[in-house]
From Swiss-Prot:
Membership in a protein family: Belongs to the DEAD box helicase family. DDX21/DDX50 subfamily.
Acidic residues compositional bias, start-end: 73-91
Lineage: Eukaryota, Viridiplantae, Streptophyta, Embryophyta, Tracheophyta
GO CC annotation: chloroplast; cytoplasm
Domains as described in the record: The Q motif is unique to and characteristic of the DEAD box family of RNA helicases and controls ATP binding and hydrolysis.
Helicase C-terminal domain span: 340-485
Protein name per the record: DEAD-box ATP-dependent RNA helicase 3, chloroplastic
């Protein structure tokens, strides 16, 4: 227990002495330490920290699990009161001992009243875990390497102890013009530097804080430094320029912070950092903060830090995302991404802020331009001037537009409150980038949503991302048109509620005339127009995502004969009911629910409308679906997951892993890479034929045939597929007699449409 917090000035082995030090005559910093010690000891419960990985010198690691161990229930606290009565008295001397949360309230930690007041005005009343972990070691002057999840309050973790010490140094002293900085904060991007400056200014308005970065006037920054400054925040390039120009002197820096340290010390930044470190006094306190901390960063960090204490609230656990972020993944084709994007934003952002991340500047511009037709959006990337960058970020923060399309320049350090949705338009290059992108939402304990777009060829990468980050995606389909319409209407209604009453008065006469003329349709027309749907929306396939197609579901009551066990039986049924539907049918997939013997398939919108109006043989039902049911190839495979597990739903001259459309679940055989197993049937990659027990007498077909979709699956319109215009199965060929069985009565020799018993 003596090494629990590694504080040489007060020993935990004598809690009574620590409590006594918290009396009225103790200094604020001493009272803070005493309160924290007594709280930690009492909550430890007689050595219970050992299992959680207590801090040990010299390079200690404090795990997040240790902090979770501190959060005991009220019942446990009451049980421990008798054993730790003297410690309880010490806490009361600090502030009454009204509970653990109160003991770690900002107001009860001995911080300067001015700092407490400004933090409370910002709604900050208690410490977050990273702030808790850093506070005491930082006040003791320890060098630190701190790691925590994105969006958990790292800026104030180093800001609070530094501000406290600067305020205490300045107490009773006059402000000296031309003073040189005592704090230097290095940040990898202009956006992060400005965020840090904003946090410090809002928390300590009486301290002079200057932010320096490239892309803006050099003279303005020179003048600000010449007037005297306490804290300098900036990017390495501009800081070096100011040092070389004689405008920035670092001889009195007592505190150095490297924020997003893994980027600061990456290739290309290390030399800049070393150049700056050469200008700093040897006697200083250095702290590195980052959401990710690879081993090689720690190695480099130890060159610049003195016996650093490592505070790691992530540890070796895979999950690095903040809790509260709901993750979705959606498989799409490259051509359907932009069409689906606006619908995803409409349904999942619900009128809130969205950041869409792209890989290239060109994509950012093009996606933003495409979205502008339906949703207000702007692009942010490296080619945009600093002035325009700031206008864009301010407009996004203020809600002047709701969608920001950005390259990864905005992923690190960009602090925009209340971002509801993150969309990865392209897969990130690495897990760390995914974590930082997604971390723009769900910040400070709030809920958020992140959606990953990927193509069929990227499934293995998505699986690797799940494994590396330790997360799980919910796989979704594009929103149905009905969902888009509903979300659009809700957003418009919320917007209408915000219209000023004085503005409404000007439009009442016109509204009354329109109401008399159109009745309820007047308001409905206004909602449709404001939602962007002045014209009827075009349907979109839930399978291929193509506009103008409708996905239908066919089911059969088990009491009415054999069910649909293959796409062939579906095309056969359609040919009996509607020759147009049989000719134009798109991809066909069987549903996974064995109790409901059915299938889903695509049809052009007009043909689907006609089919839905037709009378069907008894026991059969065709309905339009707004969400795909579970399909027979939804099961996991080696490198595929979600409901779209085949690259093209077919076998066009390549191996296709995952379950297929032939009526049975399958996967790779455990005894070899080259054998693919499907519900008892096998497909060998070294053989150009495949066994097909379900398609009538062991018919053999070359692998290059296509089954099931427009170009690559059963029910295709190509000449080599079931149910197509030139197909030998399921089409109405007047030159051949019908040899199958009627789907109505079960007798052979005639179709259901010609059945005498219907």
């Amino acid at each position: 227990m003596a090494s629990l917090l590694t504080l040489p000035s007060l020993s935990l082995s004598n809690p009574s002495a620590s409590a006594a030090a918290a009396g009225a005559g103790a200094a604020p910093s001493l009272r803070l330490r005493a309160a924290f010690r007594c709280w930690a000891l009492r909550r430890a419960g007689g050595g219970r920290w050992a299992a959680a990985g207590a801090i040990a010198s010299p390079n200690s690691v404090l795990s997040e699990h240790a902090f979770k161990r501190l959060q005991l229930s009220d019942e446990e606290e009451e049980e421990e009161e008798g054993a730790y009565g003297s410690d309880e008295e010490g806490v009361e001397a600090v502030g009454g001992g009204e509970g653990d949360e109160d003991e770690l309230a900002i107001a009860r930690l001995g911080l300067p009243e001015q700092l407490v007041s400004t933090l409370e005005k910002r709604g900050i009343t208690h410490l977050f875990p990273i702030q808790r972990a850093v506070l005491i070691p930082a006040l003791d002057g320890r060098d630190l390497i701190a790691r925590a999840k994105t969006g958990t309050g790292k800026t104030l973790a180093f800001g609070i102890p530094m501000i406290k010490q600067l305020m205490e140094e300045d107490d009773g002293r006059s402000v000296r013009r031309g003073r040189i900085p005592r704090v230097l904060v290095l940040a990898p991007t202009r956006e992060l530097a400005k965020q840090v400056e904003k946090e410090i200014k809002e928390s300590a308005p009486k301290l002079s804080t200057v932010c320096v970065y490239g892309g803006v006037s050099y003279n303005v920054q020179q003048n600000a430094l010449s007037r005297g400054v306490d804290v300098v925040v900036g990017t390495p390039g501009r800081i070096i320029d100011l040092i070389n120009g004689g405008s920035l002197q670092l001889g009195e820096v007592k505190y150095l912070v490297l924020d997003e340290a893994d980027q600061m010390l990456a290739v290309g930044f290390e030399e800049d950092v070393e150049t700056i470190l050469q200008q700093l006094p040897a006697e200083r306190q250095s702290m590195l903060f980052s959401a990710t901390m690879p081993g090689w960063v720690k190695k480099l960090s130890r060159r610049y830090l003195n016996n650093p204490l490592t505070i790691d609230l992530v540890g070796d656990q895979d999950e690095k995302l903040a809790e509260g972020i709901k993750l979705y993944a959606i498989p799409l084709t490259s051509t359907s991404k932009r069409t689906v994007l606006s619908d995803l934003i409409t349904v999942y952002a619900k009128g809130g802020k969205t950041i869409v991340f792209t890989k290239t500047k060109r994509d950012a511009d093009e996606v933003s331009l495409a979205l502008t037709n339906s949703i207000a959006s702007e692009a942010l990337h490296g080619d945009i001037s600093q002035h325009q960058r700031e206008r864009t970020l301010n407009g996004f923060r203020q809600g002047k537009f709701t969608v920001l399309v950005a390259t990864d320049v905005a992923a690190r350090g960009l602090d925009i409150p209340n971002v509801d949705l993150i969309i990865h338009y392209e897969l990130p290059n690495d897990p760390e980038t995914f974590v930082h992108r997604s971390g723009r939402t769900g910040r400070a304990g709030k809920a958020g949503t992140a959606i990953l777009m990927f193509t069929n060829s990227q499934r293995r990468t998505v699986r690797s991302l799940e494994r590396d980050v330790g997360c799980r995606f919910d796989f979704i389909s594009p929103p149905a048109i009905e969902d888009v319409l509903e979300s659009s209407a809700e957003h418009v209604i919320a917007t209408l509620r915000g219209v000023h009453t004085e503005s409404i008065q000007y439009f009442i006469p016109a509204a009354e005339r329109l109401q008399e003329e159109l009745g309820p349709n007047a308001l409905a027309s206004a909602l449709a127009h404001l939602s962007g749907f002045s014209q009827p929306p075009s349907s979109r396939s839930l399978i291929s995502h193509e506009q103008g197609w409708v996905t239908l579901q066919l089911t059969r009551d088990p009491g009415y004969g054999r069910g649909f066990f293959s796409p062939r039986s579906v095309t056969g049924f359609l040919s009996d009911v509607s020759s147009a539907a049989a000719d134009e049918v798109g991809k066909i997939f069987l549903t996974a629910d064995e109790k409901v013997q059915g299938a889903v398939f695509d049809l052009p919108e007009e043909i689907a409308r006609d089919l839905l109006s037709m009378e069907l043989p008894p026991g059969n039902t065709i309905t339009k679906v707004t969400k795909l049911p579970a399909l027979q190839d939804d099961g996991p495979a080696t490198d595929s997951y979600g409901r779209f597990s085949n690259s093209d739903r077919g076998f066009r001259n390549r191996r296709s892993r995952g379950g297929g459309s032939r009526g049975g679940r399958g996967g790779w055989d455990s005894d070899g890479e080259d054998r693919f197993r499907r519900g008892g049937r096998s497909f060998r990659s070294d053989n150009d034929s495949w066994s097909d027990d379900d398609f009538g007498g062991g018919r053999r077909s070359n692998r290059s045939s296509s089954f099931g979709g427009r170009g690559s699956s059963y029910g295709s319109r190509s000449s080599s597929s079931f149910g197509g215009r030139s197909s030998s199965f399921g089409s109405r060929d007047s030159s051949r007699s019908f040899s199958g069985a009627c789907f109505n009565c079960g007798e052979s020799g005639h179709r259901a449409s010609d059945c005498p018993n219907k």
